[in-house]
């Protein structure tokens, strides 16, 4: 429940930032924002949609929502970014599947004049104006500290990183204090959200 409230807040906050909430805006002027997420099937991102739709209504924004069905399909994300540019979006709110493979598409959108806001998982681009999400490095440290506080004696950890191609997955793993919590093994599963 807490994660869903956070998702709704992220969606609303991202759109509010883009519209310059509180600034003077002609009531007839509608700005166009594309929300491109990791998966349209994810419960988390469905909550983001709810927040984004509420903010779009409140701030008179034209909102398009798109994303691949699974969280592995960065090629579809790149195509959707290009489609948003062609459709005349003024901004993209984006959650990257692959921080490196999505970078060129985000750079191209920014060069076309779009504002870029990333949520949940950013992209390897200096064109991102705002990131809204968790401090994933600190979250990794907190998780490791919680384990270390509860266990005495030798400890061997198996690291299962949900997706090493995402910025948030990499940062959470980097937050693990390696000397005091050595990894006995490391895996990155691939699974579908269906």
Q: Where are each of the predicted segments found?
A:
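A residue-level marker of the well-folded mature domains of exported/periplasmic proteins
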Residues: 21-194
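Sec-dependent bacterial lipoprotein signal peptides
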Residues: 1-19
């Amino acid at each position: 429940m807490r994660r869903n409230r956070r998702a709704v807040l992220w969606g609303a906050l991202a759109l509010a930032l883009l519209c310059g909430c509180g600034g003077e805006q002609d009531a007839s002027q509608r700005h166009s924002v594309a929300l491109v997420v990791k998966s349209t099937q994810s419960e988390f991102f469905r909550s983001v949609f709810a927040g984004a739709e509420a903010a779009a209504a409140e701030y008179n924004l034209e909102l398009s929502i798109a994303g691949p069905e699974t969280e592995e399909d960065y090629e579809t994300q790149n195509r959707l970014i290009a489609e948003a540019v062609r459709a005349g979006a003024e901004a993209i709110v984006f959650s990257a599947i692959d921080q490196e493979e999505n970078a060129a598409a985000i750079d191209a959108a920014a060069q076309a004049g779009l504002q870029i806001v990333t949520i949940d998982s950013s992209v390897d681009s200096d064109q991102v104006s705002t990131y809204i999400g968790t401090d994933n490095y600190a979250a990794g440290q907190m998780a490791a500290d919680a384990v270390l506080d509860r266990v005495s004696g030798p400890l061997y950890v198996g690291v299962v990183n949900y997706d090493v191609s995402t910025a948030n997955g990499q940062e959470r793993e980097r937050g693990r204090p390696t000397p005091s919590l050595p990894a006995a093994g490391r895996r990155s599963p691939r699974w579908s959200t269906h």
